[in-house]
């Protein structure tokens, strides 16, 4: 078997082809550049975010212990062993921030919300979202992530760590306490990432796919943190260069690696919807979009006749494409008045006998230029005009013709 034949065999393998699809999306979304931007934003907003979270918890005395558990969790997750000095500085800054005036406190909240908005925008770009949530809905989501998310995590961590310690002592094997604690941290890291991947994008994300992406990312984060700690403990040449400031550059490197893995997990999660039916082999090929638009409208027409609305999952059962690409088509059709999204799902605004195929073709494939036409435009127009004339029919007429070919 030649080398080219082996490469062709890898390309035909479903797992290898899907892995290559994820890698290409990782590159197309410019994850390293996005991670670098998120690192800088986190560096500016980490102290305000922790301050706001702990300040909200301090309003309810019963949450004090749980907020401490959350801060400890952040210390273990964000700051690897060897860069502990950085977190000492962060805690010192956070304590100083408690003495701020009302205007300073407002700025802390604004800075914290800006970090969450940056995360939201980055995730929506990965999921190819064009329409943002209403402003009030965005604020409620951001505030929930900033307050109730950490408090819930703190409650869970406190409960789990206590249960782990009790189980280890009851079994007479306290040496397992560290392993169980790591498992507990890994569990809640997975839940936190699941919440991010499931609810932050303004796009439908199946719970199972969000869990798979979160679990893979949590394992990668824990492995990276262990390797980072091992390196800093065994190779201390960097200390002779940076001296007392050695923890700072490594903290920045770790933040960058952390965001690269988290955003990489988001890319993986958004790509999982392409696994079914091997839709990843087509990828984001725009050549079949007109066909997909017709399938979407025909499905909605059939549902309209039955008095039903269609959720996004129903489209995916009939059309071989990812949820992000499907969402783009639905949003574009909605912007141009063909469909709308209700509580139960998507609904056709008009009947199939009122939808002209040539107008859809102009919207998704080719639209003649009305002004400033040079010789190239005129030549293309001459070629495409017969095609547009052929498509001079309604969706209902096209449906009748298509059914004759079954």
From Swiss-Prot:
One Gene Ontology cellular component annotation held by this UniProt entry: plasma membrane
Protein name: UPF0761 membrane protein NMB0524
Keyword Mitochondrion assigned: no
Source organism of this protein record: Neisseria meningitidis serogroup B (strain ATCC BAA-335 / MC58)
Disulfide bonds listed in the record: none
Sequence similarity: Belongs to the UPF0761 family.
UniProt KW Transport keyword: no
Domain of life the protein comes from: Bacteria
This protein's UniProt keywords: Cell inner membrane, Cell membrane, Membrane, Transmembrane, Transmembrane helix
HAMAP family to which the protein is assigned, alphabetical: UPF0761
Compartment(s) where it occurs, according to its Swiss-Prot or TrEMBL record: Cell inner membrane
Membrane-crossing segments per the record: 43-63, 100-120, 139-159, 176-196, 210-230, 248-268
